[in-house]
């Protein structure tokens, strides 16, 4: 046990430090600047759509793991496609406006669906994606 602070105070200090570190980390790594960010996004959409367990299927004749999601998701991701591995390219108001326009047509319940492979993130438990999935679900409502 660490002395100096009551346990309740320690909890609040740790929570505050984690929130500050998380905020700084999210500012240091802009949206879609990481190589597998699109796969994390697809996993969030899958969970928000009620797909807790990834699908295993053949995609272009090869085994693939992922999910059947709204076909127009690609439109929502397109504005960010040139960001990964290009640290000189930043998210701009123009990119965000285009993404907002394209996401406006996005519906989690769209009957037009296609299979998206996301083999790396489909291995993860849904638990880390619950808050983002809830936000996506509330935003779509």
Where are these regions (language model features)?
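Short hydrophobic helices that act as membrane-entry/anchoring signals
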Residues: 3, 7, 46, 133-136
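Interfacial juxtamembrane loops and adjacent helix segments
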Residues: 50-141
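Extreme N-terminal leader/anchor segments
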Residues: 31, 39-49
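Helix-to-loop transition at the C-terminal end of transmembrane segments
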Residues: 24-38
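Start-transfer (signal-anchor) and selected internal transmembrane alpha helices
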Residues: 1-23
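Short alpha-helical segments used as structural interaction elements across diverse proteins
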Residues: 5-7, 37-40
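Conserved aromatic-histidine-acidic binding/catalytic patches
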Residues: 4, 8, 29-32, 118-126
